[in-house]
Amino acid sequence: MARRRKGRPINGVILLDKPTGISSNDALQKVKRIFFAEKAGHTGALDPLATGMLPICLGEATKFSQFLLDSDKRYRVIAKLGERTDTSDSDGEVVETRPVDVNLEKLEACIDTFRGESDQVPSMFSALKYQGKPLYEYARKGIEVPRESRKITVYEIILHRFEGDEVEMEVHCSKGTYIRTIVDDLGEMLGCGAHVTMLRRTGVAKYPYEKMVTLEQLNELLEQAHRDEVAPKELLDPLLLPMDTAVEDLPEVNLKAELTNLVQHGMPVQVLGAPEGTPIRMTSGEDKLFIGVAEVNDDGKVAPKRLVVFRDEE
């Protein structure tokens, strides 16, 4: 007897405005339950303290979440000068207090050093793993383990406000950039220490800020559906963005029906002018139905790598 799946095969991306105080995984599970989705995955964790854009992939969209993990991010951050914490944010314990002797000129000069490419050593309080365990598990036990530095790029860092011991900045950066680490490093450069008191992710890839929805809004729609005696999906599903928005920056190859059929059975196909050396977004027919991601193989053919499996709700 076939195992009955729990949840429905709904596909798409919801742009959640994550609230402060909960983990990204907790937020993911709440969204999964609200949509009664069979599968769900987020696209890069936010700290419990942080709020803002957390794209959550549902169903077949989870196959393409890696492309969002690898995408650029934008943040708004407020830092408090004069105090350093063990987590580099206000959720941690203050480990050092120093007087703040910083003027605008010195602050701007220090901020300028973060622009461009650099090597960043991740915080011990991060989800990166060492010998199979997240770093934060070691950190909570007071154990320091070696971490390799990673190449990051800060495309833009803008100082919006400097008042007393508070600094507010906007950062546009590459994947894997820890804003807490930037703030901690900035505090050390200034000689007074610093930690994050507010962090909000305002952008992931090219997703529009105004498309974000809160857990409260989703729960209200769920309650409204129950009051109106309609299926929750009638009110919730229109909020979903198409799953190919996760790969919209990839070059497109449009396939006719015959080639589509071959690709959907895992067969490489010959496509004139297909771009090499990059993942390819495959669409089918005049409607340009998204069917998956491919790469050009050594034979010069478009070889499917991740395919969308289309299933109807039971």
Swiss-Prot record:
Molecular function (GO) terms listed? Answer: RNA binding; tRNA pseudouridine(55) synthase activity
Fetch the InterPro entries from UniProt.
Answer: PsdUridine_synth_cat_dom_sf, PsdUridine_synth_N, PUA-like_sf, PUA_sf, tRNA_psdUridine_synth_TruB, tRNA_sdUridine_synth_fam1_C, TruB_C
Source domain of life: Bacteria
Q: Does this UniProt record's set of keywords contain Isomerase?
A: yes
- Catalytic activity, as annotated: uridine(55) in tRNA = pseudouridine(55) in tRNA
The active site is formed by: D47
What the entry lists under SUPFAM superfamilies is as follows: Pseudouridine synthase, PUA domain-like
Single GO BP term: mRNA pseudouridine synthesis
EC number in record: 5.4.99.25
Keywords in UniProt for this one? Isomerase, tRNA processing
Q: Enumerate the PANTHER family for this protein.
A: PSEUDOURIDYLATE SYNTHASE TRUB1, TRNA-PSEUDOURIDINE SYNTHASE
Q: What does this protein do?
A: Responsible for synthesis of pseudouridine from uracil-55 in the psi GC loop of transfer RNAs.
Name of the protein this chain belongs to? tRNA pseudouridine synthase B
Organism name: Vibrio campbellii (strain ATCC BAA-1116)
Encoding gene per record: truB
